[in-house]
Amino acid sequence: MVRWLDEIDLDPSDPPVRMGVRTLGDQSWLLQDDEEESQLALKAKLTKDESSEVFLALPESEAAGLEVCSLITGTGRQLIPDSKDLHPLKRAGLSVQEDLCLMRRDEGCWVLAAASLCFPSRWRLSEKIGREISDVHGPVTGYPEFLRKKVNSLMDRLSTTPVWRRNWFIHPDPSLYQPERPENGDPIIEAVHVHDELFLRRERQTLRRLHTARWI
């Protein structure tokens, strides 16, 4: 069994809505696997072909982006060469397999202020940039009732020591770049075709406060 599969709850019953946040401990916040070369190539292609859909940043996000670059090089990883007008978060995002998002504390709420997002699971960065976190998670079932206050509290309490969580989805499409949510829902897959027409998609998320004031 794939190692990460042991880390997610696959209870067939209706699971409780929860964040599932854990301490990262000695684990690295960045991972590398045998898909690194192909995924970095896909990121570069998406950045060229879908530029405004995979990277956006609000003004005054450069300092936080530079800190992310420092966090990456602090692990021994190398960044792609710098160039004129290259936002530091875009540079960081093109250097690692992970997508990278910056949240800023603004007027009592956390706002999505910048993101290098090449592998979205059915959401568009252009529709979420500049919006508070509860709006970003708007389509998530049970979020307003069960998670909104907990997520805001977690964000406020985050330290520079990272925590992590897992997400998982079942989609009829293995593509990493999936910005569209099916308007009429997913097609019904016959049981005999489930093994080759449905795909388990997982996300490993780490969260931390930056030293740059008011940023995560």
In which residue ranges do the predicted regions lie?
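Extended, well-ordered protein cores
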Residues: M1-I216
